[in-house]
């Protein structure tokens, strides 16, 4: 073989974008199997990918064959990336990826010319017999199929590559060229074409709607090409023993960029029986309209996430039980998906920012209506509680809920004695307790309320949970630096116990 390109994961000049693109190339080579582009050799190892061809095959023709085998269209004119391993019957997942790519890598019509009238695909949740119709723009071709904007396949080069090639926005979404075009070697630009394969794209539906981000491109930091190629193709599978969270359209709809990244990382590692991970973490690139450019989608913010967090189990529980998506109708009568709960978004953002997992939880229950909705979050809050590792958090929640249980018992006795509505008594007491927690402004005030709440529940006797962790609890609750955390934990303890009640009433259905 006269022409040979070796892309090494250890290349010191590579950024996380290069490594993600190399992961996309690795997954594509794996998908080729023995059906490689004619005249092209391909080799995949843990730390490199090798491409080669003979002198009798011009470089431009070799590239055309590589692109033709890597970037395709389905019969329904949706983008097809063989490297991601999406099956023909997964139209809803392909729809999410198609719309995501068109909104990020290929946001300009000239990069994906196609039909003017949108086509429709039915999307339904696991619980729905009939779904809603979601739309997409069918494309006749897209930029990656012919390396559009790079200059690699210009006729004037007569079969050869240029000395330098351009890096258009379709290759690296959000890339800004400024006065001068971004350029690199032909080999590097060819590699970056596979960034769209190596990344995962999610559709963002922020809870506050103040954040105008619409998409999230998750860029993995890859350390093992073979493992990553296997993992990214495994995500598209629908196994019965291993739960996947991002292998459907609805699974690609999340509240925040951090939630998207953690959901993708969990899916990457699911079912991997080896001790070695394929990635060390990722970048979550949120994209949307920004104030200084209303004409196109730009990067609105970027956050780096690690592969592991001490309390990642709490997010996993929130993601599994509260990470569902609801389908509503837009003003045009089309389907529109939104997250059913804001909790996974909040926990993911906290973990990524190295905040306490429960930080700002009070923003989710500060309004009475939000609080009432939260208490019916099925088994999700209970599962989160069981996943907590921190001893201080466990002690506070355990003590609060023991006191609340005794308070309920006293209210039950009162209801029986006086012929009152037990449910109404609980509702009033729960709301009174929520307001009392929210009104406290200092650690001392909250600690005093907490101790009085516990004492009232036992008519002056010490709670068993407090006796067991007396020193730990005392040290924690009187520390002013713990005030926000303490307040959020009390609110979480209240609503997660309320979740126990609602599940009991519903027969424990989750």
Task: Locate each region found by the language model.
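Domain-exit/linker segments immediately C-terminal to small folded modules
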Residues: 167-347
